[in-house]
């Protein structure tokens, strides 16, 4: 903890040195406003003289210096900021910062900025109103005006390497039993990689707040989408606790069985996030349950450098449920998964609120979105005779060059963007969502796998699902519960019990006895207080 606090203090000290209101003269003598931002997630820094950042600044008259979490806990960093009372211009707003009076009410300023006011529907904005009646943050992801396009499954799934599927003849895998049977068979026949590195059959991420892929799997196995905190019966509108279902007991019993067979990675429960990524980066992990964004962007450059696609080490998701006949809902349409519990906020330390609002508004212009996610025409992408964007081989190579990306591309990734199609109605807002370019730029083993299953992208491997109801996703409500409230304390206690007990349950020699002890301690936390609150939120929709 001491190390975390020191690291957080360093971050805060950096912010104090960056506090905004500063301007400078660009080479053409046009005044460029300079803003600062801290996003309480891990992210990639770009070069100070980044090409696209400078290009956008020359067009809109402003730029923003972004900083990210580095080796510290999110809550520690936010609490350290609150303790100083000084903030960068922009932060990833959430309940704790709202309660600390650190944020300005965006809805008091947005009448002059239709790009912001019309970014969401009135109904969607209402979900963001805080107890005082105002709106303090803007969700950056999942907002699409017009047609939506989806290629990636950015969420949670049981992932498996393409080499395992290819070895087995690309079988149909739909249950948790089939998933582990396949991994067991493969590792028995192929205990090592070609370089004699021992294969790791199955692992998972259990570090700190990222442990959700350990605890929330039962909801998916029962065919429910990622409400994140509960399951909701769409007919009765009743909240259900996925932690105590028969499926939960069966699933963790299965992990216990796989642990004792040597299939489940014994080091998973003590590994840090970085150690987990290091393990995946070897190419030796055959399968895991995780959310795409937690692993892909970290391991993809390593896989490319080591040419691991040639060995079939890339991952694809499988539509796994607890039993055959259950419709899987691992993938819900991206537009339905807006997280209302956090988003971009302007802080009370910002000395140019109107300028900050204009900066956000300008970033939502279609031409600027094109530059954020496609780059410069002729340099980063080309245009055919029909106006369709595509990448030449040279441009595709640049996209895979991390040094080039750091020096050249600037997506302002945690600022709001309009997804779906650009204003031209032809091109997707980002290359990752342009079907032809998406497939062409996939590793060779992914292309072979898609062809074998008759699909063109990751989403088609799972299938699409609409939002189950107006309440979805419920984690927008659970993540907004004040930690000091009775409900917040119960939620924290339940999480602590799960973090402590689930690894013990999986490793126990007597699973039944360990499960009973776990359930006894879980129920002692009065979970009904938490789930009654969630039911109340359902009833209000």
Question: What does each model-found stretch correspond to?
Answer:
Residues 69, 92-93, 269, 289-292:
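Short beta-strand and adjacent tight-turn residues that come in two discontinuous sequence segments
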């Amino acid at each position: 903890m001491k190390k975390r606090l020191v690291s957080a203090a360093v971050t805060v000290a950096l912010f104090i040195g960056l506090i905004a209101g500063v301007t400078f003269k660009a080479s053409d003598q046009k005044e460029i406003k300079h803003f600062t931002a801290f996003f309480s997630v891990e992210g990639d820094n770009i070069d100070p003289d980044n090409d696209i950042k400078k290009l956008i600044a020359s067009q809109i008259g402003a730029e923003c210096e972004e900083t990210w979490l580095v080796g510290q806990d999110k809550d520690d960093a936010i609490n350290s900021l609150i303790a100083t009372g000084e903030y960068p211009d922009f932060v990833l707003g959430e309940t704790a910062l709202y309660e600390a009076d650190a944020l300005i009410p965006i809805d008091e300023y947005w009448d002059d900025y239709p790009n912001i006011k019309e970014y969401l529907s009135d109904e969607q904005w209402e979900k963001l109103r805080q107890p005082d009646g105002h709106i303090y943050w803007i969700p950056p992801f999942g907002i699409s005006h017009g047609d939506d396009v989806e290629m990636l499954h950015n969420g949670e799934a049981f992932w498996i390497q393409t080499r395992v599927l290819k070895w087995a003849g690309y079988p149909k895998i739909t249950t948790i039993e089939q998933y582990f049977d396949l991994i067991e068979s493969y590792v028995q026949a192929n205990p090592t990689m070609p370089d004699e590195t021992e294969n790791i059959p199955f692992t998972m991420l259990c570090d700190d707040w990222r442990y959700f892929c350990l605890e929330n799997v039962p909801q998916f196995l029962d065919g429910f989408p990622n409400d994140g905190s509960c399951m909701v019966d769409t007919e009765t509108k009743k909240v259900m606790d996925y932690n105590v279902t028969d499926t939960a007991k069966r699933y963790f019993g299965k992990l216990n069985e796989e642990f004792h067979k040597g299939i489940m990675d014994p080091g998973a429960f003590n590994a840090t996030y970085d150690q987990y990524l290091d393990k995946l980066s070897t190419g030796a992990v055959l399968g895991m349950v995780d959310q795409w964004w937690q692993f892909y962007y970290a391991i993809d450059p390593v896989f490319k450098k080591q040419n691991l696609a040639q060995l079939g080490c890339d991952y694809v998701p499988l539509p796994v449920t607890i039993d055959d006949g259950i419709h899987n809902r691992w993938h819900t349409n991206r537009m339905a998964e807006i997280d209302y519990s956090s988003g971009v906020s302007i802080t009370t330390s910002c000395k140019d609120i109107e300028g900050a609002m204009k900066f956000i508004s300008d970033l939502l212009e279609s031409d600027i979105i094109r530059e954020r996610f496609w780059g410069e025409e002729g340099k980063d992408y080309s245009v055919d005779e029909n106006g369709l964007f595509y990448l030449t081989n040279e441009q595709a190579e640049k996209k895979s060059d991390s040094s080039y990306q750091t020096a050249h591309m600037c997506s302002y990734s945690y600022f709001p963007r309009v997804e779906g199609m650009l204003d031209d109605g032809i091109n997707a807002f980002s290359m990752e969502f342009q079907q032809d370019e998406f497939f062409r730029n996939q590793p060779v083993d992914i292309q072979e796998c898609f062809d074998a299953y008759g699909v063109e992208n990751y989403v088609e491997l799972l299938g699409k699902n609409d939002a189950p109801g107006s309440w979805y996703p419920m984690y927008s409500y659970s993540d907004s519960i004040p930690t000091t409230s009775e409900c917040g304390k119960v939620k924290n206690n339940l999480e602590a019990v799960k973090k402590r007990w689930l690894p013990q349950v999986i490793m126990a020699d007597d699973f039944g006895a360990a499960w009973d002890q776990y359930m006894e301690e879980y129920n002692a936390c009065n979970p009904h207080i938490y789930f009654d609150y969630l039911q109340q939120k359902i009833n209000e929709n």
